Amino acid sequence: MVRNKINNDDNLSIPRVLPSNIQAEQMLLGAIITNNALLSYVSEFLRNEHFFEPIHQKIYDAIEKIIEKGLIATPITLRSMLTQDALFKEIEGEGYLAKLITMSMMVINPIDYGKIIYDLAIKRNLINIGEEVVNNAYNSSLAVAAKEQIEYAEAKLYDLTKEGLNEKSFTKVGISISESLASINRAMKNNDHVIGISTGLLDLDNKLFGFHNSDLIILAGRPSMGKTAFAINLALNTCNNMRLKNIRDNQEIKSVGFFSLEMSSEQLTTRLLSLCAEIDSTALRTGMLSEDKYNRLRKEANTLSELQFFIDDTPALSISAIRTRARRMKRKHNLGILFIDYLQLIRGVSKSENRVNEISEITQGLKAIAKELNIPVIALSQLSRAVELREDKKPMLSDLRESGTIEQDADIVMFIYREEYYLTRKEPVAGDAKHAEWLDKLNKVYNIADIIIAKHRNGPVGNVSLYYDSQFSKFGNLEKRTFNSI
C-alpha cells in the first residue's frame, strides 16, 4: 500500500549526513602522536574502525602497531609505515601529520575525545542495523518468519550495547576478597552449607553445594536413562527453592527457564503433573482417572500454575536465538536458572560442516550466557553409542558426543546411569542357577539412579545414588526415600 505524500515543503526528504566529528578525531590522533602514553587510556574501547575518516583509521592502526612493537609513534615512524599507502600520498600525509600535532595543542582531556569518537561510531552502527532490518523486512521471502527477523534485530542491538565501553575491568583483590568473605558468611549461616541454588536432593547438594551462577552444567546419559525426567525434577526443585529463599530474603522472585527442543510444552507439563500428583502419565494421557486422582491433579495444577516456571518448546533454535530469548527473560522475569533439553538439537550460527566445530560454538555460547546473565545453565547432552558396546555401561567423559569441546567448556559434567535398566534386559531363564544371582543384583539396584559427577571444576567428583520412581519419573533422596516437596 502506497500512502499519499503530503505536499508540504517541511516534509520534503532532506539528505542526512552520518554522525561524525572529524575535529575530535584529528585532535585525539595528534595528542597520541605527541604523547604515546595516551593510547593506553583509549585503546581499551577505541578501535581503528570507530574513526569516520578512512585516513584516520589508517593512522590510528599504524600508531597501535608501532607502539606494539616497542617503538615510538612519531611523524617519522608513521611516515615510514604509511608511505606506500595511496590515501596517505593523496592527502600529502607528512604535512597532515604536522597539522594533527598542531591541533593537539588545544586538547585538554584526550579521553573525552575518544569517547566522543566511539559514541558517534556506535550511532553509525545503529543506523546501519536499522537500514539492514528495514531492507530485510522488505526483501525477505515467506520462508523467513517475522519472529526470526525480530530476534536477529534484537541480537544485533544487544551485541552493540556490549561492545567497546565496558565498565568491567580489573578488580582489586581486596574487593574480591570482601565478596568471597560475604559468600562464606552466607554459607556458614546456612545449616546445609549450600551456597548455590539447592537441587532439593541432599546428597547431590553435598557434592555440588548447589548450582552456582555463571556455571555451565552438562547432564548427559544414554536414551531411557531419565535425562529429561531428572532435568524436570531439578527445574521444579530449584524453582521452588529459589522462591522460598527470595521470599525469606524479601527479594524479587527468580524464575526458571526451560528450553524443550525435543518435547512439546504439553508433554513436558504432563510429566510435571504426573511427578507432582503422583499419577501415572499414561493415565493422564488417556484420561483414565478416578475422582480422587482428578481432584489431586487439579490441586497440584493450581500449585504449579503459581510457580515462576517458563517453557519454550520452539524446535531447532540457534544458539543466537537462545541467547536472545534468555536475555529477554532475564529482563522481564528475573531469570535465575536455565535448562536446555538438549544440546545436540541446538543449531550453530556459523553453519559449519564440521559438527565438532559447531558443538564448540554452541557450548562456548552456553557458557557465555551463564556468565553474562550470571545464572547456572544446565544443558542436557547425548552420549555416544560406544557405551552400549562395553560390558561396563557406566559412562565416562570420553563417551560425550563431540566430547573434547563439551568437557572443556563445562564447569560440571554429570552422567545419569541406571543399572536396573540394563539388568532387566539380561534376565536369565527362570529356574536357572544364574537367575537367583541376577535377582539379587536387581534387588540391590531397584529404583536407584546413579548421578556420576565426572568433572567438577570447583569441587569433588564422585557418585551420588538417588531414589528413582519410574512410574512417576520422580527422583528423591535415597536414604529415607524422601522427595523435595513443592
From Swiss-Prot:
Q: What Enzyme Commission number(s) apply to this enzyme?
A: 5.6.2.3
Q: Which GO terms describe its molecular function?
A: ATP binding; ATP hydrolysis activity; DNA binding; DNA helicase activity
List residues traversing the bilayer. Answer: none
In the UniProt record, which is one GO cellular component term?
Answer: primosome complex
According to its UniProt record, this protein's enzyme class is: isomerase
Instruction: Report the domain of life of the source organism.
Output: Bacteria
Q: Which SUPFAM superfamilies match?
A: N-terminal domain of DnaB helicase, P-loop containing nucleoside triphosphate hydrolases
Reactions listed under catalytic activity: Couples ATP hydrolysis with the unwinding of duplex DNA at the replication fork by translocating in the 5'-3' direction. This creates two antiparallel DNA single strands (ssDNA). The leading ssDNA polymer is the template for DNA polymerase III holoenzyme which synthesizes a continuous strand; ATP + H2O = ADP + phosphate + H(+)
Q: Which GO terms describe its biological process?
A: DNA replication, synthesis of primer
Q: Which Pfam families match?
A: DnaB, DnaB_C
> Can you tell me which residues bind ATP?
221-228
Q: Does the keyword Transferase apply?
A: no
Which family, according to the similarity comment?
A: Belongs to the helicase family. DnaB subfamily.
What does the subunit section of this Swiss-Prot or TrEMBL entry state? Homohexamer.
Q: What's the name of the protein? A: Replicative DNA helicase DnaB
Task: State the gene name recorded for this protein.
Answer: dnaB
